[in-house]
Each structure stands twice: as structure tokens, then as C-alpha cells.
Design a protein with these regions (language model features):
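Active-site-adjacent bridging/hinge elements
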Residues: 161, 410-417
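Short, solvent-exposed helix-loop connector elements
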Residues: 260, 385, 393-400, 415-432, ...
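Intrinsically disordered, low-structural-confidence terminal and linker regions
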Residues: 30-36
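Hydrophobic, well-ordered secondary-structure elements that form the walls
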Residues: 407, 439
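Conserved, well-structured functional cores that handle cations and Mg-NTP chemistry
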Residues: 46-250, 254-274, 278-281, 288, ...
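Conserved nucleotidyltransferase catalytic core and NTase-mimicking acidic/glycine-rich helix/loop elements
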Residues: 443-477
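A detector of single, family-specific signature residues
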Residues: 1-29
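An anionic, glycine-rich sequence signature occurring as long contiguous blocks
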Residues: 192-224, 273, 277, 282-405, ...
Length: 525
């Protein structure tokens, strides 16, 4: 019979398990010896006792720090309960299940309290996330300087049409167009960890231009339509103004293919490594647009660059096909679960040609980084980068591949903390729930970065999800439409990706038997 263990001595509980018994963390069975190893590579009871006490005290201190930015004192208790509920095991992390698990003797009253707190209370999401950032980033930076600011968006499939921002659009979770909500976020990362520091729902044009829908969902009156790259640039400008430690901007082709986004980053004096489409127009190395046509003495002189039938750019795909065999190098960028992560890459210094016929000067030289796995018939990924001209191919690859950190953020936030489980329809509740999920996530990260996990444990046991059937990364060629995969939003699709971290959080563990955390395959990028 399953028994929920809350607030008990973690060490005694683990030591009471037999070899055949499992401890379920986040819905997955973990052997007692594995938990002990995750806690610090040792089963010493004294160390685990101390850690449990410290983690409980750390949670109280963390919540107390957050309370200072949410206004009324009567919001302190629902804040703590909401975060506590998100950290506890459970298939659903919507308001009603959170009420049941945090106040089983008064579920109805707790439900009303949490519902008001997340859906209606006018506290600031930006202030809460700012306090989380100020608490967590110093702990992350103990493991190394911030290397990257990572932009991405994540989708939440929906069946109805009344939830704020829902529309038929690209859904990253499904890898295709579907009915969903999409939020844009900015994470800061080093090699050890990452943290989302900005989050905003993308409001499609059909919503932005519909006063009735906006009113029902209580969309802020001053909010106007912005594209996802425009939202991302706004988040980046805000982070700059807040004095966040700078990093290279990383983004996929959904952002990198937007010339305005790249130009905006350059105007902000930020370097980037961003995905682009194979159709990107580029000049061959050493080439560029023709200078303005000489003035004939009649009419107004022109200052615009030009092309000719004999002098014109080519696509990134065509340039890749023309590269010599010795231009390609096999680069290893990270240690995977079972093998090193490696592929073939080429890097070329060139000028993008994007609409340069409307410019008075050519684009500056950048790196075009191309990935062509040996088992593929053609290159699979392309990036543009403004990293310095003396950067090496391994440096370019290592930086580009750090974007996996934001995918890990989304994976943990969705599968472990219920990021996609909010059932309300309004703007405020959508953002409040996400901010609280990020706050809970920040607490887990702060514990991990305070007591570093075993490197060998991480390398051998951290898992990531397999991709759903029909998944197509944004920017990839469009294959024949695949049937829509069946996704159960109530059940995680993979094992806990940060087992060591979860086991060290608090003594909120569930005794039982479940799927092995080593049963799924590691997703790499």
C-alpha cells in the first residue's frame, strides 16, 4: 500500500527500505541505494540527516524571501502552499490537486485560497521572478560564469478556444501546427545550470485585435501585438537594464531566421549563435553586394547596394553542398548517457545577404556553422554567429549546443512541476502559475548548486525524453504530415531528468513501485 511521506526524517525512511523496495520521486521508482548515492555518493546517515534539515530550512528561507515582493501578508501562506504543492509528487499540479495535497483536512477552503491567489491576486510576476533570479543566480554562478542567454518558446496543446492566447500555431511539444498556447521565455545559463528569468504569453493577432476576447481573458489594455522575436528582444532589453551578467544569445531558427531579431541583437551590442533556415541567402566567402550604381548626373543618386545576374548570393544549403570534403570536422561537444555526443561540422566566414539591396552598406562578416551528421544525406542544422573571427569550430559548436539548457528547463518545468497544468483561462492566472512554477524550479536549482551533485551520477543516470511521433524541429524541412501523436498530459513521458536533485530537495517522497528512471532514452541536440 502506498504511503505518502511528508516531513519525516529522510535518512531513516531511506534506511528502512529493503533492497527490493523502491522510493518513488516525481512518479518514478528509485532504489534506496540510488537515492543515497544521489544525495552525495555516500549512505552516511549523519550526512543525510544534516542535509534534510538544511533543505527544510532552505525552503522556509526561500519562501520568506519571496513573500517580500507579493504585497499583502495574507498571501504568504498560499504562496508557500502553492510552491510546496508543486514540489510534491502528483500527476496533476492544477489548483484542486494542489489544495488536496497541501490541506487534506480542508480542501474546499484551501482550493478557494489558492484559486484566488493564482487567478486573481494582483501581485507582480516580474517582481517575483526578479526575487527568484536574485536568490538563485549567485548560487548558479558558484559553478561558473554565465555563458548564455537563451531564447525559446514552448507550447501547451489545448482543445478549446477560450483560454487566453489559444490559436492554431506552431506547437513545439507536438512539432507541428496545432491548437495551443505559446509562451516566450529567456533563460540564463552556464555549463552547470540554467534559470528562466522572463516569461510571457504570445498573443496571436486574432486575439490582439479582438476586444471582446481580450476583455473576457483580462488581457492588459496596453498590450499590443508583438511577434515572438519582438517579445524576445523586449525580454533581452529588460535583462540588460537589470544588469544581468551578459552571455551569448542563443535561439533556434524561429528567431534566428528573423533579420530584425539579429539586427536588434547587434544594436544591443550582443553576440549571438542563432539557428537559421537552409534557404538563408548568403554571399560566398570573400564576396558581397555590388556598390551603389554610379550617378549618371540625372535624377537623384542612389546609395543602395545592388546585385546583378552574374553577381548574386546563394542559399546556405547550396554553399554547404559546395564545401570541400576537408572542410568538415568531427566535433565532440558533450558526454552523453551512453556515448559522446558528436557530429560533423563546417564553419565559414561570410556575409549574410538578407535584403542587403535595401541597405547602403553590406552586412558584416559572420560565421555560418553547419552540421552534417555522417548518417544523413544532407546537412541538418545551420547557425549564424557573430562570435569573434578567431573563434574555433569547437568553440562555435560548444556554444551553439548549450541551447539544450532551455529545453531542459521546459522539460523539468512541465514534467515535474506542472507548468502546463493550469486550468484557468485568464491572462493573470496563466502568468501567475508559470511564475510560481519557475519559483519552485529555482528552489530546486538553488539546492543543486549549493551541494553539487556527483558528476559520475549525473553522467550515468540523467535522462531526457524521447520525442513524440511526428515531431519536427522548427526550421527543419517539412515532411509529409504525420498523424497527431496521442499525448496524455496527466502522465510524464519520461523519467525524472534530475534525479539527484529531486532526491535532495525535501522529504516529500512517495513509497511505491513504478517505472524505472533508466527506461527512456537520452534526447540530445
Amino acid at each position: 500500500m502506498d504511503t505518502t511521506v511528508i516531513g519525516v526524517d529522510l535518512a531513516r525512511y531511506i534506511s528502512s527500505l529493503t533492497e527490493s523496495e523502491n522510493l518513488t520521486v516525481g512518479g518514478f521508482a528509485v532504489g534506496a541505494d540510488l537515492i543515497a548515492y544521489a544525495i552525495g555518493g555516500s549512505a552516511k546517515r549523519a550526512a543525510m540527516d544534516t542535509w534534510t534539515d538544511e533543505s527544510e530550512a532552505a525552503f522556509d528561507a526561500y519562501v520568506e524571501a519571496l513573500v517580500g515582493v507579493i504585497g499583502h501578508a495574507d498571501r504568504a501562506e498560499p504562496l508557500k502552499d502553492y510552491c510546496l504543492g508543486l514540489l510534491m509528487p502528483g500527476e496533476r499540479k492544477s489548483v484542486e490537486p494542489l489544495a488536496a495535497v497541501t490541506a487534506p483536512s480542508r480542501v474546499a477552503a484551501q482550493h478557494q485560497s489558492l484559486l484566488h491567489f493564482v487567478g486573481q491576486a494582483p501581485w507582480s510576476d516580474e517582481a517575483l521572478m526578479g526575487r527568484v533570479r536574485d536568490w538563485v543566480l549567485p548560487r548558479i554562478e558558484r559553478r561558473g560564469a554565465i555563458r548564455a542567454w537563451i531564447i525559446d518558446d514552448t507550447g501547451f496543446p489545448k482543445k478549446g478556444k477560450h483560454s487566453v492566447g489559444v490559436a492554431r500555431q506552431y506547437c513545439g511539444q507536438l512539432g507541428k501546427q496545432d491548437n495551443c498556447q505559446v509562451a516566450v521565455s529567456l533563460s540564463v545559463a552556464n555549463d552547470a545550470a540554467s534559470l528562466p528569468i522572463a516569461w510571457r504569453l504570445y498573443l496571436p493577432q486574432v486575439w490582439a485585435d479582438d476586444p471582446e476576447r481580450r476583455k473576457k481573458a483580462k488581457v492588459p489594455d496596453d498590450l499590443t501585438f508583438q511577434t515572438k522575436p519582438q517579445i524576445a528582444l523586449e525580454q533581452i532589453r529588460t535583462a540588460q537594464a537589470q544588469g544581468i551578467a551578459p552571455g551569448v544569445i542563443l535561439a533556434d531558427a524561429g528567431y534566428g531566421a528573423d533579420g530584425g531579431f539579429r539586427a536588434g541583437l547587434t544594436q544591443l551590442d550582443l553576440t549571438y549563435v542563432v539557428g537559421v533556415q537552409p534557404t538563408l541567402s548568403v554571399w560566398r566567402p570573400g564576396e558581397g553586394p555590388l556598390p551603389p550604381k554610379p550617378w549618371s548626373g540625372k535624377g537623384r543618386p542612389t546609395s543602395l547596394m545592388r546585385r546583378s545576374p552574374e553577381h548574386k548570393p546563394i542559399s546556405a544549403k547550396a554553399l554547404a553542398a559546395d564545401l570541400a570534403a576537408d572542410a568538415w570536422r568531427t566535433i565532440t561537444w558533450r558526454e552523453g548517457t551512453n556515448t559522446d555526443l558528436k557530429s560533423r561540422f563546417a564553419a565559414v566566414r561570410l556575409r549574410p545577404a538578407s535584403r542587403d539591396f535595401n541597405r547602403s552598406e553590406a552586412h558584416g562578416e559572420e560565421w555560418l556553422l553547419i552540421e552534417w551528421p555522417e548518417d544523413e544525406a544532407a546537412p541538418t542544422k545551420y547557425w549564424l554567429s557573430t562570435l569573434s573571427a578567431d573563434s574555433t569550430i569547437p568553440q562555435l559548436v560548444d556554444t551553439a549546443k548549450l541551447r539544450w539548457r532551455i529545453e531542459r528547463d521546459y522539460q523539468d518545468l512541465k514534467q515535474e512541476l506542472g507548468l502546463g497544468h493550469y486550468e484557468g483561462r485568464g491572462w493573470r492566472g496563466f502568468h501567475h502559475h508559470a511564475s510560481l512554477c519557475i519559483a519552485a524550479y529555482g528552489f530546486l536549482i538553488s539546492l543543486t548548486e549549493t551541494i553539487p551533485p556527483s558528476a559520475s551520477f549525473q553522467a550515468q543516470n540523467r535522462q531526457a525524453p524521447g520525442l513524440s511521433q511526428g515531431y519536427r524541429p522548427r526550421g527543419a524541412p517539412d515532411p509529409a504530415r504525420a498523424p497527431r501523436p496521442h499525448l496524455n498530459s496527466n502522465t510524464p513521458t519520461t523519467a525524472h531528468s534530475r534525479l539527484g536533485r529531486a532526491a535532495r530537495t525535501m522529504s516529500m517522497l512517495h513509497k511505491g513501485h513504478g517505472r524505472s528512471p533508466l527506461s527512456s532514452k537520452f534526447m540530445t541536440q
